[in-house]
């Protein structure tokens, strides 16, 4: 675990390799004096000759932004190319919102800028930019309810959707899952034909994250409103090879989360990570069991990403705090399914031990009060048995 306090509010990040990352943010168009920045960082493990080792951050510099640039609101990286959601406004008119940077020595330099849509006001921005390496495509989502998939090579628009809020996307070789408003829409990657729509199991839901899992399952993280309060849940849909459709698998409420702010997932092992509005980060397994829960941020997480090898998680918040956590142990545990051995097996394993304790209890401690002692003994055993064998799924 390592922390770094940045000099600016952080809203976005992406990994460049297993040890290097880009972090973006800033004060926006306000007159706060906080500059809008796109910074490159890396970390390394330091092992001194004497004392305990620790992780330290190394700053590699900043990518120069234009004077008219807004805060960096989204980031993505693939094969020496960095993409960013940065509004550029001159005289109140939006010029562009998608930046493409290429490698130059140890930093990056801007090589192109695009505008795919027009914003109605200064509050709208590009919330998502994500490379899809399997298809050489870039997914772009903006807060004016517009979504685009463009070619990485010539930036031609391959697919677009308007009138809905898109928060996240996930893909396989032939399928595309989009978190759209209160549902997950699944498309065929080759034709962009709608294959299936998966609705959340509650009303007034907003899907904030989606990902494919092993065995073609799909997990979605969503918020919902009930009695004027906001709650958070996970739902898993399992694929039926017979019907070639996804069916409802299981649901898990995230107690006290107060909503989902960020979501990421390790597709290979099934590790699910959810950041809540209560400033928590939850690590979940493939069967939606909570593995761990940590509180490292004082403000809700604005972005978090797994390293390419899924060994480290980096998260940022609007107070400029960057946290690095090593999560390899959760990755290994996420695919392990803990089976209930059953009451009969547990009793058979405990029986010899219980008999030995009973003999000691009666013969040595209470030789003249055997009936009362037997009653007290079995009451005690029943209490211990029920306490440690009844499983609690309340997360």
Swiss-Prot record:
The UniProt record lists the keyword Repeat: yes
GO biological process: ascospore formation; ascospore-type prospore assembly; ascospore-type prospore membrane formation; endoplasmic reticulum to Golgi vesicle-mediated transport; protein transport; regulation of COPII vesicle coating
Source domain of life: Eukaryota
Keyword Protein transport appears in the UniProt entry: yes
Spans traversing the lipid bilayer: 347-367
InterPro entries membership: Sec12-like, WD40/YVTN_repeat-like_dom_sf, WD40_repeat_dom_sf, WD40_rpt
GO molecular function ontology, one term from the record: guanyl-nucleotide exchange factor activity
Keywords: Endoplasmic reticulum, ER-Golgi transport, Golgi apparatus, Membrane, Protein transport, Repeat, Signal-anchor, Sporulation, Transmembrane, Transmembrane helix, Transport, WD repeat
Membrane topology: Single-pass type II membrane protein
Segments on the Cytoplasmic face: 1-346
Annotated Gene Ontology cellular component terms: cytoplasm; endoplasmic reticulum; endoplasmic reticulum membrane; Golgi apparatus; plasma membrane
Function: Required for the formation of transport vesicles from the ER. This function involves the cytoplasmic domain of the protein, which is thought to interact with the small GTP-binding protein sar1.
Name of the protein described by the UniProt record: Membrane glycoprotein spo14
Organism: Schizosaccharomyces pombe (strain 972 / ATCC 24843) (Fission yeast)
């Amino acid at each position: 675990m390592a922390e770094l306090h940045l000099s600016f509010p952080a809203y976005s990040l992406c990994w460049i390799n297993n040890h290097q990352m880009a972090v973006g943010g800033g004060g926006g168009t306000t007159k706060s004096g906080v500059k809008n920045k796109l910074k490159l960082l890396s970390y390394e493990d330091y092992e001194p000759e004497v004392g305990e080792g620790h992780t330290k951050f190394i700053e590699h510099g900043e990518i120069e932004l234009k004077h008219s640039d807004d805060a960096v609101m989204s980031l993505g990286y693939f094969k020496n190319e960095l993409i960013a959601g940065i509004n550029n406004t001159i005289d109140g008119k939006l010029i562009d919102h998608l930046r493409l940077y290429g490698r130059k020595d140890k930093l990056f330099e801007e090589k192109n800028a695009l505008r795919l849509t027009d914003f109605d006001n200064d509050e709208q921005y590009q919330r998502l930019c994500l490379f899809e390496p399997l298809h050489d495509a870039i997914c772009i989502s903006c807060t004016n309810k517009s979504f685009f998939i463009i070619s990485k090579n010539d930036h031609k628009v391959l697919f677009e959707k308007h009138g809905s809020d898109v928060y996240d996307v996930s893909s396989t070789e032939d399928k595309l899952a989009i978190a759209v408003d209160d549902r997950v829409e699944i498309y065929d990657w080759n034709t962009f034909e709608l294959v299936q729509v998966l609705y959340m199991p509650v009303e007034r839901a907003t899907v904030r994250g989606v990902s494919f899992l092993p065995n073609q399952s799909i997990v979605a993280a969503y918020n919902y409103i009930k009695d004027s309060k906001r709650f958070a849940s996970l739902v898993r849909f399992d694929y039926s090879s017979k019907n070639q459709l996804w069916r409802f698998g299981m649901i898990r409420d995230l107690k006290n989360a107060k909503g989902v702010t960020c979501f990421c997932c390790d597709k290979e092992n099934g590790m699910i990570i959810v950041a809540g509005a209560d400033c928590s980060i939850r690590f979940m397994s493939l069967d939606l069991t909570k593995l761990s829960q940590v509180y490292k941020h004082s403000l809700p997480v604005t972005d978090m990403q797994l390293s390419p090898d899924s060994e480290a998680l980096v998260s940022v918040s609007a107070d400029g705090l960057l946290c690095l956590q090593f999560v390899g142990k959760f990755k290994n545990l996420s695919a392990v399914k803990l089976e209930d051995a059953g009451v009969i097996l547990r009793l058979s394993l405990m029986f010899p031990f219980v008999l030995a304790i009973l003999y000691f209890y009666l013969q040595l401690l209470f030789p003249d009060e055997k009936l009362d002692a037997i009653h007290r003994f079995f009451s005690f055993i029943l209490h211990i048995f029920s306490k440690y064998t009844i499983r609690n799924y309340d997360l």
